[in-house]
Amino acid sequence: MKDLLNLFNQQRQTLDFDAIKIALASPDLIRSWSYGEVKKPETINYRTFKPERDGLFCAAIFGPIKDYECLCGKYKRMKHRGVVCEKCGTEVTLAKVRRERMGHIDLASPVAHIWFLKSLPSRIGLMLDMTLRDIERVLYFEAYVVTEPGLTPLERRQLLTEEQYLTARQEYNDDFDAAMGAEAVYELLRTIDLQSEMTRLREEIASTGSETKLKRLTKRIKLIEAFLESGNRPEWMVMTVLPVLPPDLRPLVPLDGGRFATSDLNDLYRRVINRNNRLRRLLELNAPDIIVRNEKRMLQESVDALLDNGRRGRAITGTNKRPLKSLADMIKGKQGRFRQNLLGKRVDYSGRSVITVGPYLKLHQCGLPKKMALELFKPFVFAKLQRRGLATTIKAAKKLVEREEAEVWDILEEVIREHPVLLNRAPTLHRLGIQAFEPVLIEGKAIQLHPLVCTAFNADFDGDQMAVHVPLSLEAQLEARALMMSTNNILSPANGEPIIVPSQDVVLGLYYMSRALENKKGEGMVFANTSEVKRAYDNRVVELHAKVKVRITQVDVDAVDGKRTSGTSIVDTTVGRALLSEILPEGLPFQLANTEMTKKNISRLINSSYRLLGLKDTVVFADKLMYTGYAYATRAGVSIGIDDMLIPDEKKGILTEAEAEVLEIQEQYQSGLVTAGERYNKVVDIWSRTSERIAKAMMDTIGTEKVENAKGETIDQKSMNSLYIMADSGARGSQAQIRQLAGMRGLMARPDGSIIETPIKANFREGLNVQEYFNSTHGARKGLADTALKTANSGYLTRRLVDVAQDVVITEIDCGTTEGLIMTPIVEGGDVVEPLKERVLGRVVAEDVYLPGNDEEPIVTRNTLLDEAWVAKLEDASVQSVKVRSTISCESSFGVCARCYGRDLARGHQVNIGEAVGVIAAQSIGEPGTQLTMRTFHIGGAASRAAAVDNITVKTTGSVKFNNLKSVAHASGSLVAVSRSGELSVLDGHGRERERYKLPYGATITAKDGDAVKAGQSVANWDPHNHPIVSEVAGFIRFIDFVDGVTVIEKTDELTGLASREITDPKRRGAHAKELRPIVRIVDGKGNDLTIPNTDLPAQYLLPPRSIVNLQDGAAVGVGDVVAKIPQEASKTRDITGGLPRVADLFEARKPKDPAILAERSGIISFGKDTKGKQRLIIKDTDGSEHEELIPKYRQIIVFEGEHVTKGETVVDGEPSPQDILRLLGVEPLAAYLVKEIQDVYRLQGVKINDKHIEVITRQMLRKVEIVDQGNSKFLNGEQVERQRVIEENARLVKRNELPAKYDPVLLGITKASLATESFISAASFQETTRVLTEAAVRGTRDNLRGLKENVIVGRLIPAGTGLAYHAGRRKASGLTDSEMETLSGKPAGAEPVAALADAGADEE
């Protein structure tokens, strides 16, 4: 008995560790693991099935095959435990030791370990400072290498060919040593003196000037440092002893018919042993050199194949031409150890079945088939049967259960009571894909699911299956009930809105009962209360949709102290809404329900209920809503028939008009007035506009009907057309779908995304002809192919996101930072896309917020969590911007703090310590991935129409405000914009921004700053098709380098007869004219150059190719006049990457193809001399220093000579690269850019994601910094280090009054960031396993197991949520002090143990 207890204690000890270290194994270490040498390649005897002695399965080395029984059978049973049989050499013990006992092979010749040789960068190569090519020549016996030059002029590590070697031998006899093969490499590595090599390199670094040399030296220093710190020796990268894996991990199983199924490793080991033995024999026989060398080479190859098959040369294949699976293949990839067995395991106590609807269930319940429940809860049932005395033994209980006696079911009922089960639907894209329910036993074989949780699971009932899991332990049940119960997950963690929202039938029923119709039976009646209404309705005195007056009792709940006050009032409503008011919980205002219950309104209702009344009432209310919805959907009996698809009468006329327009454009094209591209764009435009018009006409036809009201007048009212009801309520279908049924099908896309210019004019009711049908299948198939690709891509994005953010956990309440992001409302083209209140809701304020124009009394103080009430206050005070805390600026050393994160979106209060916000962020961004599109949009058609805006018409009455605008006053009295980034906003009476517009260069602005404007007034206009060049001074024009027929071509407009000049493309000019640069200069009356105001630059404008000048030489120009214009169709063909690929590009921080070029500093623009293919752009700083930039000719420079730019402003058009934004503008603008761009993609698809989630990922992308100046730190210049490491090291240096290191932030893509994490276990299980493990082993890296993934892999509770407390408790119990704990958790110690100890000593004195 005591032994058993000891056994348990032993197991406990192995679980209690705080870090895992990986390092190179020395030959002695390998021998110490081993239980004996494997000398023979034999496996098991095919007749007796017993392992051969000294073979790969030898019982003497690896342990017995049967528990407590030696191989020859002399010793059997427990009593001989620990005896070693003298006959067969087997130790009598448990057979499972065959899973852990290793053997070894003594290699007759050293062998280079392929990982350290071939895994780039080659570690052996770096160590020896030789190229991989050279080392391989030595290893594979093609060249000699000098290992010890002695007194000869030869150099150490010099390669010699066979001839050179022989010559050298004759010349110097035995004064030098040279060798080939792994022995030579081993010798070279063994004789390296790391310490002196290190000193030499540091000196060399100080003296070298070449960039490439520096890189190589830094790499070598880092490698040698790693060897010194980890205690590894370089020669261990060449193996002299090979460990042999325990046999049960590479099993050999006899199949019937005398064949064997075996692990590939056995084949690989056999090869190694065979060659090793042969080599040993050859060496004993003193065989000729050439044979021995060949054998050594073969040994090297076979060991390579065993470790990593296919890394070098062709992979060794087995009998069936399939490459053998080597040790490296076992751990990497989706089928490898990490991802197949450690991160995802099969789970017992689980079952799966088809799901069906359970409309009568409560929200916390699910229907579990009796058969399933019995199987899942079997042990519990057995135990209870025994306890009740219904069965004496387990076996008897089993019999009872198998017979399914009546009492078994009663006991099952008891066992299941209040024992929650987990339901999971694959794919589990976010945490709501697994929820807990209380099971209700049902007949049948399908699991019943509550309809309201379908949205969260993304489930429907067309054959979906779900898995059931039983939480066994008490803690597990508790967590399931408290955290995972469906009733505790009403809000979505992605955006904080209710996810338990009725859909489809329920919405239809609620919408139907809450519609108001004219002149229905009982209109105008007055009722004393809702029960009276119910009575009247049940007795058919009133109809459901009749407008009536009802006295309704309202209960108001005070938000602060929860006091309830009630009052009654008579309300105009309908019978249906009055009935609906009966199910409203007390305290929810009736006006919320006194509308048409569309899906949006129902969602708003549930949201208000949750915020006002809390969880419990809301859950009960949601259930009642569902029951009511189903009941009335049944009564409504809504069905659709072909006659519901009403085709508008106007359709014919609209189509005729469009056809005429298209014909006209076709004629223009044939007479050469428009280009093919313009014609296509215009045609597509016309059709998309027509399609819209028909859709509108159709919605009017379907959506309204004429009725008589009570007074006998005919009026329009919303129709009760079944199709319209469904779309309007949000139950099913949308305007776009109805348009295809009853309007026109519209334009179709080709598989490459371009639009077919002939639209489908018919709709589905009229039917398509053959050509139309063919055109429509074309795009539809693409859709199906897209969906399949999309799922895979989206899943991969989610995996990368989870991996990069998995270790972000809330670790403290407040990090104390004062930094944050400044939030303003998002305004685009006159619409407030996202008001300030939505952006700051649930955030913590970083700085006190004052009323605009009042700095005395703050409205909100720092560190306030903004909830709905606070946000409303800000809105009333019309605050424009708030600085809020953000995870990006959080200063916690590990994880983030609760204040910087703000509100836990799924719970509605400040986030708890231990919440795994990183994983939540990754899931929230990844989950909607499948809804995003896959294609890249070509700008054309609808998109370009939106782009051709040519004026600003304000939508609200208020005042005009210019931001960032430079303008000149035109003679006509209006202003002309001469800056690119200018914006015009409209403020309302409170000074709140309502609209914001971009003002393009050259726009004529008819309003002044601060002017009052009325809604509908036009305040600016411009020519959308031409980019003007505006004169900033008044004077006369002088043409320079205008050579007719060479640099300019004169054209005369056929219609107007006016002459204009077009600048030619320099590529098309002759060699002599390449240098000519057409310039328009502005001079005064005497011909002297004028300068641009506030600068000393001449007023001259360099004209790009294809620009058109309408003025004549010597013509007078005024301020703000157009000197030349550049036609703008060229830049319109840029593709926009949309949807999923765009999100992936942003998170991977990829540089766009032709990135925008940003100004490296602030200053004045001028152009230098052009080179062959590039233009030279110069920015002159205020202090006179210059910055030059060479820009390819084909790029569009959007700044002009003499213009002032600020650092980070765009000077060349294009998509900005995130790295540039970070470098020139800093972290906050980068964060803002990433959030905006990613949100734009999701917003287009109507997906709401909170900014926080994107910020959490951005924080992880900014984990690393690059050292610019090492100071006195241990880092090297150009090294990338975790930001936290540098901050800690700097703090230490400052304490000692030494120079701290300087650094710049680095932006890594999510894949790179995941691989660069501190934890090698997490990185290895993600991608590039070999590279990560090689690197970690050389460094002797220790993994402190701080992230979630590492802990899952080693099989412990994760340090998040309830696991956080467990880990804290475990550390307390192990009796470690705080400082020791810090060391373990990876604070500064560990990397420099000696220094740390010296420090500690110094401090104590």
Curated annotation (Swiss-Prot):
One of its GO terms (molecular function) is magnesium ion binding. GO terms for biological process: DNA-templated transcription. Keywords: DNA-directed RNA polymerase, Magnesium, Metal-binding, Nucleotidyltransferase, Transcription, Transferase, Zinc. Mg(2+) binds at residues 460, 462, 464. Binds 1 Mg(2+) ion per subunit. Binds 2 Zn(2+) ions per subunit. The keyword Cell division does not apply. Zn(2+) 2 binds at residues 815, 890, 897, 900. It catalyses: RNA(n) + a ribonucleoside 5'-triphosphate = RNA(n+1) + diphosphate. Its cofactor is Mg(2+); Zn(2+). Its EC number is 2.7.7.6. Pfam families: RNA_pol_Rpb1_1, RNA_pol_Rpb1_2, RNA_pol_Rpb1_3, RNA_pol_Rpb1_4, RNA_pol_Rpb1_5. SMART domains: RPOLA_N. GO terms for cellular component: DNA-directed RNA polymerase complex. It is an enzyme of class 2 (transferase). Residues 1375-1405 are annotated as: Disordered. Zn(2+) 1 binds at residues 70, 72, 85, 88. CDD domains: RNAP_beta'_C, RNAP_beta'_N. InterPro entries: DNA-dir_RpoC_beta_prime, DNA-dir_RpoC_beta_prime_bact, RNA_pol_asu, RNA_pol_N, RNA_pol_Rpb1_1, RNA_pol_Rpb1_3, RNA_pol_Rpb1_3_sf, RNA_pol_Rpb1_4. It comes from the Bacteria. DNA-dependent RNA polymerase catalyzes the transcription of DNA into RNA using the four ribonucleoside triphosphates as substrates. The RNAP catalytic core consists of 2 alpha, 1 beta, 1 beta' and 1 omega subunit. When a sigma factor is associated with the core the holoenzyme is formed, which can initiate transcription. HAMAP family: RNApol_bact_RpoC. Belongs to the RNA polymerase beta' chain family. This is DNA-directed RNA polymerase subunit beta'. It comes from Xanthomonas oryzae pv. oryzae (strain PXO99A). The lineage of its organism: Bacteria, Pseudomonadati, Pseudomonadota, Gammaproteobacteria, Lysobacterales. The gene is rpoC.
